[in-house]
Amino acid sequence: MEWSVDANYSYLGMNEFLNPVTNAMDPINAPRHKMGMKLQYNSRRYPITGSLNARYVDGFKWSSGIYFGDIRPYTLFDVHLGYKFNDYLKANLSITNLLNHMHTEIVGGPSIGRVMLLRLQTTF
């Protein structure tokens, strides 16, 4: 099969828990809804592969030590390309957050934009 599609969804039924130390409700630091979809191509004829991935992460409350606040929902698109030169050498290019949507995944952490990674892999 040259083309394949994959989809996933997760639902978290709770968004807070009773902290036994403070005896107060704390956020669980995770989104209620997450979903993803992947369209993948694996050529039978040529030594190439590729995929386009989409991810959605729902907004949620965050609390950890001195850091607390809201994580805004975000949608990201990723691209992965691979080329097999021979039985011993492969190259992979991954572009995460293709559209450079600046977003925060944890309160107190940096905003994350596009990340590109080129990997050469050898086997022997």
PLM region spans:
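A generic structural signal for short
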Residues: 24-27, 66, 105
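Short sequence motifs at beta-strands and strand-loop junctions characteristic
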Residues: 27-34, 71-74, 110-112
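Gram-negative outer-membrane beta-barrel transporters
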Residues: 1-61
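C-terminal beta-signal and adjacent terminal beta-strands/loops
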Residues: 55-63, 70-72, 79-124
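Hydrophobic core residues within well-ordered beta-strands of beta-rich domains
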Residues: 3, 35, 48, 75-77, ...
